Amino acid sequence: MSLPPLPALVVLDVNETLSDLSPLGAAFAAAGLQEHEAEPWFAGLLRDAFALTAAGAHPTFGELARESLLVRAHGRVADPDATAEQVLEAVRGLPPHPDVADGIRALTALGTRVVTLSNGPAATAEALLGRAGVADLVERTLSVDDAPAWKPDRRSYLHALDACGVGDAGEALLAAVHPWDVDGARRAGLRTAWVDRRGSRYPAYAAPADLTVTSLVDLADRLRAR
């Protein structure tokens, strides 16, 4: 059986796939909240975004992030606005995972185009790639702010393909840490790679990934060996 061709386009998720959210706990504590709140805050933000998208709304990441922090800080700190801004500044300055720079270099060395597609602002992704030293290797930093809906709505992935001039979804591969993102891309016709950074179990209710990798470097290695 012949192996599938190298994807013409690799679409990278940003939040948690490229960015390391682990420093957020300390940022929450420094802003007057609790360190353990960082992870449920981010999960709740995504939950509310998905619910609003399903209801027909199209909020921005910034709007939801700020308001959800104000709700969490209400009655607990003297200046909720300052607390929210302090946490958001930490979000905007998150570091990349250690494999990101080498992984993106390895992917582009294969001859495939690399872009990002985020539910967050394009500027945040651009700054993250700059800190990783690979901004010049990523063709475009796409955001659902310019798409009809948040990921995992299929329209967000098709928007990315259209922006990149890719007519056949099967010529693109999405790589993400979130099974819901992998599922959405798969249902939109893209090939997929689940970036399993934690040694987790992939949920059986999600459409399976074509590849399971541990890092972007591993992804490039797997594509090279196809």
Regions found by a protein language model. Give the residues of each.
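Asp-based, Mg2+/Mn2+-dependent phosphohydrolase catalytic module
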Residues: S2-L12, A101, R105, P121-A122, ...
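Active-site neighborhood of HAD-like aspartate-dependent phosphohydrolases
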Residues: S2-L46, A73
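Alpha-helical elements of Rossmann-like donor-binding domains used by nucleotide-donor carbohydrate transfer enzymes
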Residues: A26-A27, P40, E67-S68, Q86, ...
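Short helix-capping segments at alpha-helix termini
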Residues: L33-Q34, G75-A82, A109, G133-L137, ...
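A metal-dependent, Asp-based hydrolase signature
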Residues: E35, A49-Q86
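Short, acidic loop-to-helix structural element flanking the phosphoryl-transfer center
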Residues: G62-E63, D81-T116, A122, E126, ...
